[in-house]
Amino acid sequence: MPLLDSFRVDHTRMDAPAVRVAKSMSTPKGDDITVFDLRFCVPNEEILSEKGIHTLEHLFAGFMRDHLNSNNVEIIDISPMGCRTGFYMSLIGTPSEETVAASWKAAMEDVLKVKAKSDIPELNEYQCGTYEMHSLEEAQEIAKMILDRDVKVNSNEELYLSEEFLKEHS
């Protein structure tokens, strides 16, 4: 099985919260696609709560689009990581990590402004696969944590795991 790019970075040295370009590619028609690692928690030390990350998934996707989409950028998808330490965001365009960080913080401010569970989008059995597994309070605690800690940038070069290192530690 091929080694995916996300497993070529040292998770023991990642800052969090932090933005990292996880992958960049161009389509055959020339569109630039960028995948960002939006790391909310320090890997292997912290984890986002089940209900909090789920509610955040519903809120974050819309709020990030409000702040980041433009004539040059269009978000394709924002999805939680299986390890529950952050989200992956795929988009058309090449915004800087600093632009993404600013949009992320603005989106977290928006999460804090949500007044009630009834304001969470798509929160019903028809549009959500686990519609009862939500907590606005936990999502807002996560948003506050991001804003309190501020968002940094993780460098691929600094986190890169060499073939030799991987062979020694596998």
Swiss-Prot record:
Keywords: Autoinducer synthesis, Iron, Lyase, Metal-binding, Quorum sensing
Cofactor note (record): Binds 1 Fe cation per subunit.
GO process terms (BP): quorum sensing
Entry EC number(s): 4.4.1.21
EC class name: lyase
Catalysed reaction, written as an equation: S-(5-deoxy-D-ribos-5-yl)-L-homocysteine = (S)-4,5-dihydroxypentane-2,3-dione + L-homocysteine
UniProt cross-references to Gene3D superfamilies, sorted A to Z: S-ribosylhomocysteinase (LuxS)
Signal peptide: none
Assembly with partners or alone: Homodimer.
Reported function: Involved in the synthesis of autoinducer 2 (AI-2) which is secreted by bacteria and is used to communicate both the cell density and the metabolic potential of the environment. The regulation of gene expression in response to changes in cell density is called quorum sensing. Catalyzes the transformation of S-ribosylhomocysteine (RHC) to homocysteine (HC) and 4,5-dihydroxy-2,3-pentadione (DPD).
Protein name: S-ribosylhomocysteine lyase
Lineage start: Bacteria, Pseudomonadati, Pseudomonadota, Gammaproteobacteria, Oceanospirillales
